């Protein structure tokens, strides 16, 4: 039974999603047993007689999302190089009826940074080397370096002395709304700036950390690097000078 719930998503919870249940062979008894257990917690059950096919389906669900995010990450990079407004480009593209909009970002968590490698590894053993799937992984893994380089360029441009720079990293968990830091590239970004600038702290109400600031302490900081987007972070933009936001 591949896991399908989306942490932090209150709408698509275990009760609401289509639940895939896989079993081998023709045993009606096994199917009935699975049905009797899962119907108590899931509204819709989808059955498969092949466990490998069910697990592959789970893999491509994550690969598809990983690739979509990678595409928008790459578009963001290109727009920045061409001095174009990424948000305006996407707004215009979104007026086409079949355009699918995604947000660029730092991919983390238990699934997206990991699952693509399971399928590409097996495919390689069978004689096929993945091109598209691994390209998406390359782009999404690169985003950590891209964010660090972009922020460092901005900080150098400010011409503020190193010992006067006080950085607040906004959002450290792998996605907004969860307390999980599994495979979070944001942690690595935070470590980079913490090592380089001693006066570096974070603000993430979903995370318990000694470096976590309280909301009323934010005014003391002169640079803010936003790594997550969400309701609890939107007030910061109103609190501080927009020139301080990276």
Language-model regions: role of each:
Residues 1-246:
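Structural/interface elements that position substrates and couple domains in central-metabolism enzymes
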């Amino acid at each position: 039974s591949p896991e399908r719930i989306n942490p932090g998503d209150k709408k698509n919870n275990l009760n609401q999603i289509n639940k895939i249940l896989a079993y081998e062979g023709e045993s009606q008894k096994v199917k009935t047993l699975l049905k009797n257990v899962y119907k108590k917690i899931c509204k819709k059950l989808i059955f498969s007689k092949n466990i490998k096919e069910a697990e592959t389906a789970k893999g491509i669900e994550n690969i598809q999302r990983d690739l979509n995010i990678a595409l928008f990450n790459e578009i963001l990079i290109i727009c920045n190089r061409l001095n174009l407004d990424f948000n305006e480009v996407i707004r215009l593209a979104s007026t086409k009826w079949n355009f699918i909009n995604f947000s660029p970002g730092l991919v983390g968590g238990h699934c997206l940074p990991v699952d693509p490698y399971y399928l590409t590894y097996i495919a390689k053993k069978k004689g096929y080397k993945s091109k598209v799937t691994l390209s998406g992984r390359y782009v999404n893994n690169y985003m950590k370096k891209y964010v660090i380089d972009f922020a460092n360029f901005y900080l150098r441009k400010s011409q503020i002395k190193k010992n006067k720079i006080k950085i607040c990293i906004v959002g450290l968990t792998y996605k907004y709304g969860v307390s999980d830091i599994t495979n979070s590239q944001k942690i690595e970004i935070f470590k980079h700036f913490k090592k380089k600038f001693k006066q570096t702290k974070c603000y993430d109400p979903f995370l318990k950390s000694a470096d976590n600031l309280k909301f009323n302490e934010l005014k003391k900081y002169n640079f803010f690097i936003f790594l997550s987007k969400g309701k609890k972070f939107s007030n910061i933009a109103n609190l501080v000078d927009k020139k301080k936001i990276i």
